[in-house]
Amino acid sequence: MGLFKIILVCFIAGIGAGLGTGFAGLSAASVVGPLLSTFLDVSPYQAIGVGLISDVLASSISAYTYHKSGNLDIKNSLPLLLSVLVMTITGSVVASYVPAKAMGSTMQIMLIILGLRFILVPIKTTKAQMNAVSKKEMLIKSVLGGIVVGFICGFVGAGGGMMLLFVLTSLLGYQMHMAVGTSVFIMAFTALTGGISHIAFGGIPDFTVLMFCCLFTLLWAQIASKIANKVDTRTLNIVVGIVLILTGIVVLVFNNL
């Protein structure tokens, strides 16, 4: 494959993946995977691996940006993180035995529905309301939510970003900025675990493709996360909703080409 084509596809994938990560806490793999498979003939399993490795850097820099703005809850998210990590490995192993065609089918419809939800019924929870939730209740919900999210992360290869955002806002009652910041923090670890597992079972991907995807995704994630931390909750709800809907539509189209 030509270098120009690789750079162009990775740049476009990086824009979508980076904006999705920085604004909405989405996994880079949900965008990178279908684009690499469609235009660069990378196997779906390896394409997801590239997306997850790109996700590690993008999520890490985004999490740092949210942390600087006080929008990252590390302590209370640890039970969720640990349960997600355990199930990510399980999901990734199971996915290695699934036909490539099945791997191309993700959760685009759910992305669109969740996007509409944030626009039509925005999250209005404040940090004070979030902190008033019982620690025991949050622990139980975190572990249960983590089991589901982790398996999805490993199996679908989407980093569980969409499900993490849903669990944090709807199940655990997080404030919107805090939910996105905590989501990308957890995703940095889940994507690393999932990425290593995908490479271990699916082989090492093309280094040039991996390098450019990581570079462009990191760049756009940094830009998006800085903007996200400067807008109010209502605006962030709308932005997140739009990003989710567009991502769902774009990935749905490419998966059916």
Stretches with model-predicted labels:
Residues 23-32, 157-167:
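Transmembrane helix boundary and interhelical junction motifs in multipass membrane proteins
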Residues 1-6, 10, 53-64, 112, ...:
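Hydrophobic, membrane-facing alpha-helical anchors
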Residues 1-19, 33-39, 44, 65-151, ...:
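Juxtamembrane transmembrane-helix boundary motif
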Residues 126, 158-163, 174-178:
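Short, structured loop/turn "capping" segments at alpha-beta junctions
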Residues 18, 48-56, 85, 180-191, ...:
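Transmembrane helix-bundle signature of multi-pass membrane transporters/permeases
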Residues 54, 182-198, 208-221:
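A small-residue-rich subset of transmembrane alpha-helices
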Residues 42-50, 75-76, 173-184:
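Membrane-interface alpha-helices at helix entry/exit sites of multi-pass transporters
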